[in-house]
A protein has these predicted regions:
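FAD-site-proximal beta/loop scaffold in flavoenzymes
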Residues: 1-63
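Short beta-strand-initiation
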Residues: 16, 70, 129-131
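Beta-strand-connecting loop/turn residues
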Residues: 17, 30-31, 73, 139-141
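A generic short alpha-helical patch detector that favors 3-5-residue windows
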Residues: 24-27, 63, 67, 152, ...
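Solvent-exposed alpha-helices and their adjacent loops that cap or buttress functional pockets
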Residues: 26-27, 31, 67-68, 124-127, ...
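Active-site-proximal substrate-binding core of FAD-dependent oxidoreductases
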Residues: 40, 58-95, 179
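Conserved protein kinase catalytic domain
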Residues: 53-56, 72, 83, 161, ...
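Flexible, glycine-rich terminal cap/loop adjacent to redox cofactors
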Residues: 76, 86-203
C-alpha cells in the first residue's frame, strides 16, 4: 500500500497480497475500511459498488439495503448473488449455480432450456444463436441459477439475479408477462420447458 495513500503511521495487515478485512470490511486499523480489488474480493465493479454502499450505510448508522457475507476462510468477501457478464457477440451472462455446480453440492435440480433460434426478436434481428438455461431446486422449484447466451443477455440476467436473491419459484416467475417481441420472452419459454420436463404444462 503506497505510503502517500494512507500516511506513514498507518500499518494495515495484509493477507495473501491483499488487505485483510473482517465481515464488516474493517481493516486492522480502526476507522479504515477496504472494499473491492484491494480486499481480495470478486473483481467486478458492481461487487465493489455494493460493498461500498454497505460500508457507507454502516458508517452512517442506517439500515443495510445490501446483504453481504464472508466465505469460510475469511479472505473473500462476496455477495449472495453476483451476476457475471461477458460482452461478446452474442453476450454471455450467468448468475447463481450451474447444473454441474449444484450436483457437486449434492443438490437435486431440474432445468429448463430454450434455444433462441425460435425467439421472435431473434428472428427479426437475425441473431438466432444462443440459449437460456435455468436451474431450479428439484423439490421447491426455486430458481438457483441461470446461464444466458444471446443478444442483451447481460441485461436479461438482472431479472434472474433478482429472482434468485428473493427465492422466487418457477411458478412465481411464470406470473410475469414478458412483452412481444423481446429476447426476454425466452425466459418464459425456458420456464415452460422446465414444467414440460417435469410432466407439467404451465402456460
Amino acid at each position: 500500500m503506497p505510503a502517500w495513500l494512507m500516511g506513514q503511521d498507518v500499518n494495515l495487515e495484509m493477507e495473501n497480497g491483499h488487505l485483510k478485512v473482517d465481515s464488516e470490511f474493517r481493516t486492522s486499523e480502526p476507522g479504515i475500511y477496504a472494499i473491492g480489488d484491494v480486499a481480495a474480493n470478486i473483481k467486478l465493479a458492481h461487487v465493489a459498488a455494493a460493498q461500498g454502499t454497505y460500508v457507507v450505510e454502516k458508517i452512517a448508522g442506517v439500515g443495510h439495503t445490501i446483504r453481504l457475507s464472508v466465505v469460510p476462510n475469511g479472505m473473500f468477501v462476496k455477495l449472495p448473488v453476483v451476476p457475471s457478464c461477458i460482452y461478446t457477440e452474442p453476450e454471455i451472462a450467468s448468475v447463481g449455480l450451474t447444473r454441474e455446480a449444484a450436483s457437486a453440492c449434492s443438490m437435486k435440480v431440474s432445468c429448463g432450456r430454450y434455444s433462441m433460434s425460435g425467439n421472435g426478436k431473434s428472428i427479426i434481428t437475425r441473431e438466432q444463436n444462443g440459449f437460456i438455461h435455468l436451474v431450479f431446486e428439484e423439490y421447491s422449484g426455486t430458481l438457483i441459477g441461470a446461464q444466458i447466451v444471446c443478444p442483451r443477455a447481460t441485461d436479461m440476467i438482472s431479472e434472474m439475479a433478482t429472482a434468485i436473491a428473493n427465492g422466487l419459484t418457477a411458478e412465481q416467475l411464470m406470473l410475469a408477462m414478458r412483452a412481444h417481441p423481446t429476447y426476454s420472452e425466452g425466459i418464459g419459454a425456458a420456464i415452460e420447458n422446465y414444467f414440460e420436463t417435469k410432466g407439467e404444462i404451465k402456460r
